[in-house]
Amino acid sequence: MTAPRRLRKELSDLQGNALKSFRDIKADDDNLLRWTGLIVPDNPPYNKGAFRIEINFPAEYPFKPPKINFKTRIYHPNIDEKGQVCLPIISTENWKPATRTDQVVQALVDLINDPEPEHPLRAELAEEFLKDRKKFVKNAEDYTKKHSEKRPAD
């Protein structure tokens, strides 16, 4: 299956699945290789907001992994200030062409709901998460209230 055919199918499948944690999924009108969507986490401290992401697929997809970037700022040890994500499923060494976008999105939602401080992009947040969870949760909640997008109504 060619990249455009596979991407159209995956986009259609994702849009039809009505995932509560990934909404408003669309491809760029001029570029099927660029998608946007809204991550809607279930767990505190992120469950008071929603986070816009962009998924960029390489022309060689599915043989090369997509890249995910957060467009909404988030206080999270695995996502840096530029919105880059440390997500093992899409690392070059772990990527498998059979991996579908819905699996990638689910791994991302799981990471948001359950940070992995042992693989941080922001060491200071990982340290705070490990040493003072209460402070981390308060900071993340405040940051989410200030910077996140409004959650869609169910």
From Swiss-Prot:
Report the EC code(s) recorded for this entry. 2.3.2.23
Q: What InterPro entries does this protein's entry cite?
A: Ub_conjugating_enzyme, UBQ-conjugat_E2_core, UBQ-conjugating_AS, UBQ-conjugating_enzyme/RWD
Output one GO BP term.
ubiquitin-dependent protein catabolic process
Q: What happens when the gene is disrupted?
A: Nuclei in larval muscles (myonuclear), are mislocalized and often clustered, likely due to mislocalization of the LINC complex, demonstrated by the aberrant localization of the complex member Msp300.
Q: Which SMART domains match?
A: UBCc (SM00212)
Can you state which reaction this protein catalyses? Answer: S-ubiquitinyl-[E1 ubiquitin-activating enzyme]-L-cysteine + [E2 ubiquitin-conjugating enzyme]-L-cysteine = [E1 ubiquitin-activating enzyme]-L-cysteine + S-ubiquitinyl-[E2 ubiquitin-conjugating enzyme]-L-cysteine
**Which GO cellular component does the record give, naming just one?**
nucleus
UniProt function note: Ubiquitin-conjugating enzyme E2 that acts with the RBR family ligases LUBEL, ari-1 and possibly parkin. Accepts ubiquitin from the E1 complex and catalyzes its covalent attachment to other proteins. Appears to be involved in the selective degradation of short-lived and abnormal proteins. Functions with ari-1 to control the subcellular localization and morphology of muscle nuclei (myonuclei) by regulating the protein levels and distribution of the LINC (LInker of Nucleoskeleton and Cytoskeleton) complex.
Write down what this protein is called: Ubiquitin-conjugating enzyme E2-18 kDa
What organism, scientifically named, is this protein from? Answer: Drosophila melanogaster (Fruit fly)
Tell me what gene encodes this.
Ubc10
